[in-house]
Amino acid sequence: MTKDILILAVETSCDETSVSVIKNGRDILSNTVLSQIESHKRFGGVVPEVASRHHVEGITTTINEALVDADVSMEDIDAIAVTEGPGLIGALLIGVNAAKALAFAYDKPLIPVHHIAGHIYANHIEEPLTFPLIALIVSGGHTELVYMKDHLSFEVIGETRDDAVGEAYDKVARTIGLNYPGGPQVDRLAAEGEDTYSFPRVWLDKDSYDFSFSGLKSAVINQLHNQRQKNIPIIEANVATSFQNSVVEVLTFKAIQACKEYSVQRLIVAGGVASNKGLRQSLADQCKVNDIQLTIPSPKLCTDNAAMIGVAGHYLYQQGRFADLALNGHSNIDLEEYSAE
């Protein structure tokens, strides 16, 4: 009988302290998440120093809770996986150093995991990945289209040239007057309004899979500024609908076109913005029309969590891709350089 592989995973790249135990690359035995949203809400966004402080305060308790919830001990664990980047460097270092301490104390292999690879592998938990596939990554810090021909093989075929889609959502939300985190509130409002503004769709060069959201963001900000200057009433739901329609149309079109060009029948979506109901519906509609299998994780697996890191870590474990205790956190890591040879 094949021995079960247990991975203890640690994720601290931004404002969630999360630890998970994953069995055999798919089964979540525990997935403890300590959120910091309330602490950052009064600042209107994540404050790196505050995030780091909360990680320091919560990491030990979160590790213990994950082990208890999984009903395992450190002796049962086969390897420690940890997000090494990209992310907030101070936040990353808390998780990396905690993972290194565990690896040293219990003589376990240490597995560095790319944060975006983790988001991609969140899909594998609910629906096993089949290749080739196109991955649409949409989050607060990243907007990318990635072609994968096999496990841990990443070819970035498109990326944002300026703002990430989640960043644009948060800035538009603040301009409208919505509280942090603004993305989910824009999505909720968008379901209630009408596309009365017809904000621009930014397609960039012909056949390009790159994205740009800074112009759209500026168009929304300028529109609302002009209305306020002229005392013209602002219907928040219409602003949200018009903005979201512009974003979703571009994301959907480019994702579908990439599937067609690369002869791929599987599209997966990853990152916090994958929770967006408008985007999920648009992709579902177009994938159905084009006979493409669509996978989007449950909302709880779209946001940052250690389970996704553990799943990616499992495949790195199988390839023997370990780090020594000199491992450090990195605020920026190229996904393609991280790809398996």
From Swiss-Prot:
Annotated cofactor note: Binds 1 Fe(2+) ion per subunit.
Binding-site positions, Fe cation: H115, H119, D304
Annotated binding of substrate, by residue: I137, V138, S139, G140, G141, D170, G183, D187, N276
InterPro entries found in the cross-reference section: ATPase_NBD, Gcp-like_dom, KAE1/TsaD, Peptidase_M22_CS, TsaD
The keyword ATP-binding belongs to this UniProt entry's keyword annotation: no
Catalyzed chemical reaction(s): L-threonylcarbamoyladenylate + adenosine(37) in tRNA = N(6)-L-threonylcarbamoyladenosine(37) in tRNA + AMP + H(+)
Name of a matching Pfam family: TsaD
Keywords for this protein: Acyltransferase, Cytoplasm, Iron, Metal-binding, Transferase, tRNA processing
UniProt keyword annotation of 4Fe-4S present: no
GO function term, MF aspect, one: iron ion binding
EC number: 2.3.1.234
Cofactor(s) named in the record: Fe(2+)
Gene3D superfamilies, per database record: 3.30.420.40
SUPFAM superfamilies reported in the protein's UniProt record: Actin-like ATPase domain
Family label: Belongs to the KAE1 / TsaD family.
Protein name (Swiss-Prot/TrEMBL): tRNA N6-adenosine threonylcarbamoyltransferase
Species for this entry: Staphylococcus aureus (strain JH9)
